[in-house]
Amino acid sequence: MLSIFAQTTQTSASEPQQSPTAPQGRDNGSPIGYSSCVVA
């Protein structure tokens, strides 16, 4: 599941990465931002 999410998040990784403080709420997708935090 993480692998698939990571691949899909890679395209929109710039957005959550820019706001690592609160990617959950700032990002359009809660799971996408969360995955970025966990993977990072």
Curated annotation (Swiss-Prot):
Pro-peptide region(s): 38-40
GO CC terms: plasma membrane
Residues the record lists as Cysteine methyl ester modifications: 37
Covalent lipid adducts (S-farnesyl cysteine), residues: 37
UniProt KW keywords: Cell membrane, Lipoprotein, Membrane, Methylation, Pheromone, Prenylation
Topology in the lipid bilayer: Lipid-anchor
Pfam families on file: Mfa1
Main localization of the protein described in the UniProt heading: membrane
Cell compartment(s), UniProt: Cell membrane
Biased composition (Polar residues): 1-22
Molecular function GO terms recorded: pheromone activity
Region ranges (Disordered): 1-40
InterPro entries xref list: MFA1 (IPR035382)
Protein function: Mating pheromone for A1 allele.
The protein's name in its UniProt record: A1-specific pheromone
Lineage: Eukaryota, Fungi, Dikarya, Basidiomycota, Ustilaginomycotina
Gene name of this polypeptide: MFA1
